[in-house]
UniProtKB/Swiss-Prot annotation:
Domain of life: Eukaryota
Transport found in the keyword field: no
Residues bearing a lipid moiety (S-palmitoyl cysteine): 331
Protein species of origin: Petromyzon marinus
Residues covered by region (Disordered): 1-20, 341-360, 388-420
Extracellular membrane side: 1-46, 109-123, 187-210, 285-292
Post-translational modification: Phosphorylated on some or all of the serine and threonine residues present in the C-terminal region.
Topological domain ranges for the Cytoplasmic compartment: 72-83, 144-162, 239-260, 318-444
Alphabetical UniProt keywords: Chromophore, Disulfide bond, G-protein coupled receptor, Glycoprotein, Lipoprotein, Membrane, Palmitate, Phosphoprotein, Photoreceptor protein, Receptor, Retinal protein, Sensory transduction, Transducer, Transmembrane, Transmembrane helix
Tissue: Pineal gland.
Protein's name in the database: Pineal opsin
Protein family (similarity comment): Belongs to the G-protein coupled receptor 1 family. Opsin subfamily.
C-alpha cells in the first residue's frame, strides 16, 4: 500500500489519495488514503447515518425485486413479452442492491473503503453497469409501450423473440458504456467521502473528460429522449382517441389517469438521475471545485433509491401482478379477498375502448381505469368474423370459445362472406366474456 501511495496516479491505475476537500465542520481535509482510514473532518455519526440509510434501502430493494422475480416465475400469465423488461428491471435493481448497497452499508460502518483497490474497481464497475441496465430498461419499457399502442409498423406485433432481442441490446450496450474505465479509458475510483467507488469525475485529464461526456450522452440524454418521445406519442394517441369519443366520461378519465402515471414515471426518472448527471457535469467542467464530501455523496444515494420505487411504480401498481403477488403470501385471508375481488372485476371493472380502423382490421386500445394496463389489439377473427380479444400487453386472455355461440358465429361468418360489415364495440363497457361479446355483436 505504501508503494501504491508513492506511485504517481495514471489513467490505468486507481489513485490512492483523494484531493483535499472542505469537511462537514468547515475544516479542510488533507490528502488521505481512502483504503486505510476515514476522511478527516467528518464526524463518525455521519457514516453511521449513511450506513443506516443504505441498509434500509438495500433491504427494501432486495425484498421488492426478489418478490417480482419469484411471482413472475410462478405465474405463467405474467410471463408475457411486455413483462420481460419489467423482470429485467427488477433483476438489474436487485444486483445493484446486492453488490452496491451491501458494500456501501459495510464500508460506511467502517467509515472508509476497507476492501482495497481491486474491490473498489469491481464495485464501481458493477454498480455503474447494472444501474445503466436498469436505466435503459426504463427507456426500453417506454418504447415497447409506444410500439404496442401506437403501432408505428402497422400489424407487426411484439413477440417473445423481439423482447429478448431488446434486452440483449440493453445489456451489451450498457457493457460497452461502462467497461472502458476498467480497460484504461478513465477509471473507477473512491468517491469524495471515500466509502463508495464511481467513475472518475474529478480528473482534469482529457481522456477522463471525453469518457464522462460519452457516458453522460449515452446513459442519460439518449434514454431520457427515448422516454419523452415514447410517452409523448402515447399521450398524443390517447388524446386523439378521446376526441373521437367526446361523450364518454370514462374515456377522458382513463386518458387523464394514464397521463398522470406517465408524468410520475418521468419525474421519478429525473429525481433519480438528474442529481447524478448534474453533479458529474459540474465536477467534470470544474475539477478544482471544492464540495462538501457529504453533499457530493447525495447524488449517488439518490440513484440507489430508484431500486426501491421502481418496482412500486412499474410493477406493484399493476393490478394483475398485485393479484398474483397476494396469492404467494402466507395469509389465507388476503388470498380469499383477492380471489373475490378478481372474480368481481370481471363484472365491475370498466375500460375505455378506443377504436382505430385500418383496411381489413379493427384495433382496440383498452385502458384499464386503475393502472397502465394496455390490452393490445381486438380484431375480427379470420374464421368467424367475430371480434375476439387477443393477447393483451398485460398478459390477459379472452375466455375460451363457448359452444353456445356456434349459431351466432355461423351467422357472423355468413355476414362476412356477404360483405355485411360487423360493428366493433367502441363504447365504454364492462369487461365481457367471449359469449357476451358475441351476443352483443350478432344477436340471435
Amino acid at each position: 500500500m505504501d508503494a501504491l501511495q508513492e506511485s504517481p496516479p495514471s489513467h490505468h491505475s486507481l489513485p490512492s489519495a483523494l484531493p483535499s476537500a472542505t469537511g462537514g465542520n468547515g475544516t479542510v481535509a488533507t490528502m488521505h488514503n481512502p483504503f486505510e482510514r476515514p476522511l478527516e473532518g467528518i464526524a463518525p455519526w455521519n457514516f453511521t447515518m449513511l450506513a443506516a440509510l443504505m441498509g434500509t434501502i438495500t433491504a427494501l430493494s432486495l425484498g421488492e425485486n426478489f418478490a417480482v422475480i419469484v411471482v413472475t416465475a410462478r405465474f405463467r400469465q405474467l410471463r408475457q413479452p411486455l413483462n420481460y423488461v419489467l423482470v429485467n428491471l427488477a433483476a438489474a435493481d436487485l444486483l445493484v442492491s446486492a453488490i452496491g448497497g451491501s458494500v456501501s452499508f459495510f464500508t460506511n460502518i467502517k467509515g472508509y473503503f476497507f476492501l482495497g483497490v481491486h474491490a473498489c474497481v469491481l464495485e464501481g464497475f458493477a454498480v455503474t453497469y447494472f444501474g445503466v441496465v436498469a436505466l435503459w430498461s426504463l427507456a426500453l419499457l417506454a418504447f415497447e409501450r409506444y410500439f404496442v399502442i401506437c403501432r408505428p409498423l402497422g400489424n407487426f406485433r411484439l413477440q417473445s423473440k423481439h423482447a429478448v432481442l431488446g434486452l440483449a441490446v440493453v445489456w451489451v450496450f450498457s457493457l460497452a458504456c461502462t467497461l472502458p474505465p476498467v480497460l484504461g479509458w478513465s477509471s473507477y475510483r473512491p468517491s469524495m467521502i471515500g466509502t463508495t467507488c464511481e467513475p472518475n469525475w474529478y480528473s482534469g485529464e482529457l481522456h477522463d473528460h471525453t469518457f464522462i461526456l460519452m457516458f453522460f450522452s449515452t446513459c442519460f440524454i439518449f434514454p431520457l429522449a427515448v422516454i419523452f418521445f415514447s410517452y409523448g406519442k402515447l399521450i398524443q394517441k390517447l388524446k386523439k382517441a378521446s376526441e373521437t369519443q367526446r361523450g364518454l366520461e370514462s374515456t377522458r378519465r382513463a386518458e387523464q389517469q394514464v397521463t398522470r402515471m406517465v408524468v410520475v414515471m418521468i419525474l421519478a426518472f429525473l429525481v433519480c438521475w438528474m442529481p447524478y448527471a448534474t453533479f458529474s457535469i459540474v465536477v467534470t467542467a470544474c475539477p478544482t471545485i471544492h464540495l462538501d464530501p457529504l453533499l457530493a455523496a447525495v447524488p449517488a444515494f439518490f440513484s440507489k433509491t430508484a431500486t426501491v420505487y421502481n418496482p412500486v411504480i412499474y410493477i406493484f401498481m399493476n393490478k394483475q401482478f398485485r393479484d398474483c403477488f397476494v396469492q404467494v403470501l402466507p395469509c389465507k385471508g388476503l388470498k380469499k379477498v383477492s380471489a373475490t375481488q378478481t372474480a368481481g372485476a370481471q363484472d365491475t371493472e370498466h375500460t375505455a375502448s378506443v377504436n382505430t380502423q385500418s383496411p381489413g382490421n379493427r384495433h382496440n386500445i383498452a385502458l384499464a381505469a386503475g393502472s397502465l394496463r394496455f390490452t393490445g389489439a381486438v380484431a375480427p377473427s379470420p374464421a368467424t368474423g367475430v371480434v375476439e380479444p387477443t393477447m393483451s400487453a398485460a398478459g390477459s386472455m379472452g375466455a375460451p370459445p363457448n359452444k353456445s355461440t356456434a349459431p351466432c358465429q355461423q351467422q357472423g361468418q355468413q355476414q362476412q362472406q356477404q360483405g355485411t360489415p360487423i360493428p366493433a364495440i367502441t363504447h365504454v363497457q364492462p369487461l365481457l366474456t367471449h359469449s357476451e361479446s358475441v351476443s352483443k355483436i350478432c344477436p340471435v
